[in-house]
Amino acid sequence: MEDRTFKAKLVRYIDAGFPIIYINTFEEDKVDSLIPEISSGKEVYEWNETNGYIDFETKTPLQEDCTLERMLDQLKTPDLLDRKILIFKDITSYLDEPRIVSKVKGLARMINQGVDATVIIVSSVLVIPKDIEKYVTILEMDYLNTDEIKTIIRGFVKDNLNQQVDEN
């Protein structure tokens, strides 16, 4: 699948109001590069294990030591969730905790009832608790194909052909 097709699918799913989009990939940076293109003026926030609750664009923490549960608590009303895209990374280990699953389900239900928001889970490990299964749409991001790899290698060689090699 080419990036254009993946991106087009992601846009369609967001526009259609799919509450939770689970992007199964090892390439978090590739997903990050697409988000600004598809956010349609919505505020984008991220939660990850390392930095907590952060502004997606600047990658600066919005709160010190903000746990996933605390972030979810802050978005539990429609007016606080509206016009947002929430990116969750490093949360698969939390998806066996009933309190977390319940809060994620609450977000999904609000989105299903018309709140203009999307939850995007980015992970290389597919973990979907039964309680939120019906709200989740899985989107696979394929790896580079042979032609894409050749293009990257040619570009690298072209860019570096005239540079001196330091042999020390």
Label every model-predicted segment.
Residues 1-168:
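ATP/nucleotide-binding catalytic cores
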